[in-house]
Amino acid sequence: MSAEPRVRVSAILRWKGRVLLCRHEKPGKEYWLLPGGGVNGGESLVDALHRELAEEIGIDDQLPVEGPVAIVDSIAPQRSFAPKHVVHIIFAGDLGGRSLEAVTSKDAAVRGHSLFALGELDGVILHPPIQRFLSRWQPGDPAVYLGSLWAP
């Protein structure tokens, strides 16, 4: 397999015991991601995260972030039609008094948003599949490498 790794930053954003996820679609398939996206050349991880949060959920100010709190490799299996390798660098955002009920997106790839209770994540198709980590993570926890996790 020969796939150049792509770096993706994202943020765990919790509000009233729930976590915000962005809905994406591929033909015949719906899946969810933490808000975030790709890092451009010459852009710091935190700058990329702030840019992506503005695009995907409309938070235009410099949201305070913790982390990174986790790193995940998503490497497509050898038998996959297209080689793919994404390195996910996950931060956590401090929303302060902001509400996530009126989230808006400027990104055409985002088909919607939803707040999920941490106990509801098991039935969600999440890329990468980090439901267990999200349900256990607490602010101040040490950063962890979650290994190679792939969700087709």
Where on the chain are the PLM-derived regions?
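Intrinsically disordered, low-complexity sequence elements enriched in Ser/Thr/Gly/Pro
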Residues: 4-6, 12, 21, 82, ...
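Unchanged
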Residues: 39-64, 72-126
